[in-house]
Amino acid sequence: MNRTLFAPVIAVLGLLLQPSAWALDEAGSQRLLSIQQRWAEVQYDTPEKQKPAEFEKLALQAQAFTQEQPTAAEAWIWNGIVVSSWAGAEGGLGALGKAKQSKASLEKALQLDPAALQGSAYTSLAALYDRVPGWPIGFGDADKADALLRSALQLNPNGIDSLYFWGDHLYRQGHYVEAKAALLKAKLAAPRPGRELADEGRRGEIDALLKDVEHKLD
């Protein structure tokens, strides 16, 4: 499996979510934030060659979190994100298998609480459907991504992630005017306390995609 098929998943998934987690106690919320912040460190401050090993370590922590908090959708969301990031960093034949594991974790989160972390499971799962190859190689499906993103926007209409992924989806579908509007709105989203590095990375992605959109509109 070509690593480039999954590389975008690293960036797009791990930037999701605010640190608030109403279904978790204080210790669980701190554990969640620790995983989120470590993800950002690996993603943005770690050399490429070291990322697979570091994501593998973080995946073990995320899996342990789901075992400790099996009814917390937040734990399953981040397990899915970390495993997907590991797949993107490692590449190779195992990438699709890890993407499927990520999908299963996100679906579990939706079963437990679709509204957890402002519906971020919808957004994360949509990102997978938009980026993983379609049949017969993988499970990618633009129509499913569209439906999931609409659900995410109902729960979080002004979030930087839901708007970014919606703009990205519209761009992929050739709806450049609508994509630009969504991305410009995403730039106005409020910052997320504790997720400064993630927000910085997301805004960089927004700016980069806006350049691509403008090129298509020229």
Description of each model-found segment:
Residues P70, P114-A116, P157:
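Short coil turns that delineate tetratricopeptide repeat
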